[in-house]
A protein has these predicted regions:
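Terminal leader/tail segments of proteins
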Residues: 1-112
Length: 112
């Protein structure tokens, strides 16, 4: 995991705002949610109350986007990972692989 991703994950875990290079974390105290922004795209929103994670590429299925999403998934110990095959994104667990779609929500090891 890259240093920037470790710092990003620390900000999510500690519920603080953080910014470095092209990545930032915005914590909203009113909603108790952390939003991860890559460039100008919110790629993940983590609800600390429900422990649900909403994923989004904003159409930017780049190596960096996948790396940031996988770092978050690893930190939250969701059991999921994002990968690309033949230009299509997928989300996998130990049990299944599904097509990735923007707006998918993960919670309790399930895709909602």
């Amino acid at each position: 995991m890259r240093k920037i991703e470790q710092q990003m994950n620390n900000a999510i875990s500690n519920k603080v705002d953080w910014n470095s290079s092209n990545t930032r974390v915005e914590y909203n105290n009113n909603t108790n949610c952390s939003t991860v922004v890559l460039h100008r795209t919110a790629i993940a929103v983590y609800d600390h109350n429900t422990q649900a994670l909403k994923l989004n590429t904003g159409g930017w299925q780049s190596v960096t986007t996948k790396s940031r999403l996988n770092a978050i998934l690893s930190e939250l110990k969701c059991g999921f990972r994002v990968f690309q095959k033949d230009f299509d994104l997928y989300l996998s667990t130990n049990h299944q692989t599904v097509d990735f779609w923007d707006g998918m929500i993960l919670s309790g090891g399930q895709i909602l």
